[in-house]
């Protein structure tokens, strides 16, 4: 069709050309080439100029491990919070779930309350003077007094409970999907939902959460890294690698690391000290808790 249009525009057709065959042999390819270029130009002009740009991959977040502390190897860590020079930890598993206050340097439990045996404890966060703890599949969230761990109230949460943090106003919850939920703390009313993604697409299995300097940090279930999430767009803008942390910092052999990970001993604890700008990282059943200084 393009070639025919060109012939019409030029007002001549091949059968009417009065020239030597050899000349026709060179002219016809030239016209076909010009027609092809014209078609490509038209196609380019019809392409939307406002197509979505490619999503850049997450930037590497460098860090330095500045201290290593002991951690209870029986603690199936599901949540970790640092507040007023105290470390708080939520642990999981049926018949074993608890809420604890832990001495940072020794790893000793200073105060503890056990959950009902029918509840599987999950993430924790502290907002003002209240500790909030999720449960896994029981659709129950529990509020405690920070001072004495006295239970204050229970809330219904319609999804699974995995990780929880807060931005000073709202509770922020994960449920193992690629979604993060902003929730009103007074009644657990859902305020908004954030879809999390990186350059490869949606990222699911988001677990433990921590609010750090205006961003959401999350570890991914049974993975050895932490991602930094923009709380407005949901885009993953940074990533911290903790590959083979048990070998590096707890001196496990590769076989020992593989064995304990079969029992669930994966990275799953993030706590931020906003005063000293330091991060604490541990995992389920880990023997060590790391104090980390972010490099950027």
Residue locations for each model-derived region?
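C-terminal motif of bacterial Sec signal peptides marking the signal peptidase cleavage site
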Residues: 34-36
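Bacterial signal peptide processing site
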Residues: 38-41
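A short helix->beta-strand "capping" segment at the edge of beta-propeller domains
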Residues: 52-73, 104-108, 252
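Beta-strand-rich domains and repeat architectures in extracellular enzymes and scaffolds
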Residues: 66-98, 114, 118-125, 283-285
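Beta-rich, blade/repeat-based domains predominating
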Residues: 73-84, 117-127, 157-168, 200-214, ...
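Conserved beta-strand positions in repeat-built beta-propeller and related beta-rich domains
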Residues: 89-93, 132-138, 173-177, 218-222, ...
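Short loop/turn segments that connect beta-strands within beta-propeller blades
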Residues: 103-107, 145-149, 185-188, 230-234, ...
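Hydrophobic, well-structured mid-protein blocks that either form specific transmembrane helices
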Residues: 143-199
């Amino acid at each position: 069709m393009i070639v025919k249009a060109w012939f019409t525009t030029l007002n001549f057709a091949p059968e009417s050309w009065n020239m030597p065959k050899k000349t026709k042999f060179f002219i016809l390819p030239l016209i076909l080439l010009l027609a092809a270029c014209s078609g490509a130009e038209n196609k380019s002009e019809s392409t939307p100029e406002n197509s979505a740009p490619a999503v850049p991959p997450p930037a590497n977040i460098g860090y330095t491990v500045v201290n290593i502390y002991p951690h209870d190897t029986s603690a199936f860590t599901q949540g970790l919070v640092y507040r007023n020079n105290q470390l708080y930890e939520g642990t999981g598993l049926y018949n074993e779930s608890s809420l604890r206050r832990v001495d940072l340097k020794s790893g000793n439990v200073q105060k503890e309350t056990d959950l009902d045996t029918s509840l599987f404890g999950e993430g924790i966060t502290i907002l003002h003077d209240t500790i909030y703890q999720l449960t896994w599949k029981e659709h129950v969230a529990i509020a405690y007094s920070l001072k004495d761990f006295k239970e204050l109230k229970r809330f219904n949460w319609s999804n699974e409970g995995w990780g929880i943090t807060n931005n000073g106003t709202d509770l922020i919850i994960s449920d193992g999907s690629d979604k993060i939920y902003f929730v009103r703390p007074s009644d657990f009313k859902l305020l908004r939902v954030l879809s999390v993604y990186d350059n490869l697409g949606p990222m699911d299995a988001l677990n433990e959460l921590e609010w750090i300097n205006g961003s959401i940090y999350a570890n991914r279930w049974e993975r050895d890294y932490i991602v930094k999430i923009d709380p407005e767009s949901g885009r993953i803008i940074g990533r911290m690698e903790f590959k083979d942390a048990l070998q590096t910092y707890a001196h496990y052999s590769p076989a020992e690391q593989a064995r304990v990970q079969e029992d669930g001993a994966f990275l799953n604890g993030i706590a931020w000290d906003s005063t000293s700008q330091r991060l604490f990282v541990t995992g389920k059943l880990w023997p060590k808790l790391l104090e980390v200084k972010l490099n950027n």
